[in-house]
């Protein structure tokens, strides 16, 4: 019995030793044989052989084992990387070379800010006494203020660079604009302002002599002048042309293009809603429309007296006419340039523009080959230009033959051009300010 127990114990001890030897063999020799299987992923091209770098082999093999938290670790790494990029982005966004405040004291200021700069205003209520907004373009940070409460001497001036937007169309407006310029002049003299530019709604006859003494080239302090209409002063050095834009004073909105605006069949060939002046080209236009019966194919609504403000109903009718017409007829008024041109562009309705120079001192065709509408023409406006309304019947006959798909492409082209036009103006305006104001700072 004792012998049997002794043999059993010896057998168990021998079995234990064999198992230990097997385990040791597996630990020291088995893992080495596994190395080639892991090498395609664990060892990169040009890595040292396993025999020479056992320590590296060990860590490489361990790194190739499946890690259940690998996905979470990668996500965390990506999150950290994203966060660092956001921090960097925020830090660079705040870095601007120039701060400019725009004082909007004419309705054209809203076209500049909301339509060209695509800026927002707080509050959004158009009747608010004080409205403001901010935007960054290029290296310039803009702030914009407007409203009846923006009065000379009644708000704090804590900027060095100002763009003043004024209305100089008639005597009463000129008097008001002059008060603002005298206020700005005083700020420059006491060194509260360093640089000043003016955006001016000029006179429709281009009679703007009143502002001449304020220009820097004439000994004044206004470094840059952006002026509406084809002024003969425009030289693209210190006087630049600026567009009239839409009638923001009549609450014409910022229009977002829609699928239906582009693709729907429009029921009217053309539209004209406006005031008819006696012995004017507008009267000639109406006669031509009626003569050929095209007034029945177009949305036409004429009135005898100009109205400075629209009712909600009349504004909606006008917008519907633009939206539902392929062409918008744009006869000259006191000046060739009119709000209707830009409003038609907003709705993808091709402007048919009476391309004739009106009376007054605006740029003449013998000196300025692009006049009238130099700015629009220089930027490739895809309009239909005619010299006489007698050409209109032929235009409308051609329009009747154009299929919907061609009209869709034409609308796309017009809307894309108009967006590009506004973007280019924003960048050009900013580049001019930066070049002038920053250069003068260095000198």
Swiss-Prot record:
Keyword Membrane: yes
One GO CC annotation: nucleoplasm
EC number(s) reported in the record: 2.4.2.61
Main location: Golgi
Disease linked to the protein: Muscular dystrophy-dystroglycanopathy congenital with brain and eye anomalies A10: An autosomal recessive disorder characterized by congenital muscular dystrophy associated with cobblestone lissencephaly and other brain anomalies, eye malformations, profound intellectual disability, and death usually in the first years of life. Included diseases are the more severe Walker-Warburg syndrome and the slightly less severe muscle-eye-brain disease.
Biological role stated in the UniProt entry: Acts as a UDP-D-xylose:ribitol-5-phosphate beta1,4-xylosyltransferase, which catalyzes the transfer of UDP-D-xylose to ribitol 5-phosphate (Rbo5P) to form the Xylbeta1-4Rbo5P linkage on O-mannosyl glycan. Participates in the biosynthesis of the phosphorylated O-mannosyl trisaccharide (N-acetylgalactosamine-beta-3-N-acetylglucosamine-beta-4-(phosphate-6-)mannose), a carbohydrate structure present in alpha-dystroglycan (DAG1), which is required for binding laminin G-like domain-containing extracellular proteins with high affinity.
Official protein name in the record: Ribitol-5-phosphate xylosyltransferase 1
